[in-house]
């Protein structure tokens, strides 16, 4: 793969990256993902260390982001869309960290839409998650009730994507206001763009 393969960049990228490491997160450890979970690109070793110094515990999960994450929905009725599958692995340490957060009445903050899907797929009641691996085909859209995630960091996404549907599920009608502000202020969208912090989802 390092010799013959190419980085599967999103379709809105043209040409090649000058530095492929720019499309790699500080959390990456194994080969398998077809795309970077781009919300993680906002985190540097300095940012991670700063969070730790403030008492923020970081728990990692293994994600295999699929290429379909970039593809727009081709149906007008969102209920008719068949979402792609993505493989994941939740270590025991991550499941234990979620449980410890619940005991101290803390918040579970997901970094990226794939992490949100993963945690919600592995939900087992009372805001907890099961350790282990599997495939997620969970389609989080308006009306979905979050069972694990209390807040999230995510990029600004393209229209007609399942990523926008997920943001709308978390923010309700406020997502349009948030995106209008982003456009007005010139925030950058997509993989190397800016991020938003969803603090209080409407259904948590």
Question: What is each of the regions a protein language model found here?
Answer:
Residues 1-204:
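Surface-exposed, charge/polar-rich loops and edge strands
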